[in-house]
Amino acid sequence: MTTSILQDRAMLATLHISQWTNRKHDKTVSAEVERNHQATDAGRYNKQLVDRASLESIAKVASAARAYHYKVTLPWGDNGDRLLPGALFMDYRNEMATFKGRFSSEVSAFLTRYPMLVQDAYKRLGSLYVATDYPHVGEMRSRFAIETSFAPVASGNDFRVNLNDEYVDQIKREINERNAALQRASVVDCWTRVRTVVGNIHERLSKADNKFKDTLIENARDLLDVLPALNVTGDPELAKIEKDVRDLLVPPQRLRDDATLRSETARKAEELLARMGMSGQSLSLETA
């Protein structure tokens, strides 16, 4: 697929999440430990400034937002950009707006408790307590954020710097070659996700005494819900295997109650794994 076609089908999405670390390096204690043990460069003592549990709800929202971001995007380079299919943009924007709202609410709740948490820390830390370790409430709010940004997929044809034609052509080729490699990597990522959910189904269902959670099937369903959109390169083999994986989406309780159905589903999963083998990766490298 050419970059120009990909530019029509997808964009780059970046997710930035910041949170207060709730840690502070105590140089005095670190030096004291080294003196007591006659050690050098032995480590760092980091204080936990407030009760860890007070930040858990914020961390959970951040983790869920990050998981969703990775679920509906594909890898694209190593600078934090991810490839977001245009077909998923509206869902992405709405979901992220929800995450941002939840995140803001949890941060506000934390800030309401923050003065009391600092007082508790004064008692808990004893002589390790240092007032300047704790930002003011107004500054603390700025330590938390969920931000998203979007950009078009770059193309060699977009490069228009005033240079010698020879250098311009070379840079354009390098950009297009890099894009081609990134496209291949994005398709391989799709195949890896498919193999993972099918492999998990086979592993858990192949033995009658293996227990499994409902998420075994739910995770596969979640992937298939976005896989057609993630297949931005139009890989026909990926589209074909997606339909076959849907046959594995049997209600979990039926699989627990019906040994024959469970065995048959495990067999289908095994056949799909055999069909994919390493072919999923090789096919995607050829068709990307």
Features from the language model and the residues they span:
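Amphipathic, heptad-repeat alpha-helices with coiled-coil/zipper character that mediate oligomerization
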Residues: D51-P75, G138-A154, A185, D189-T192, ...
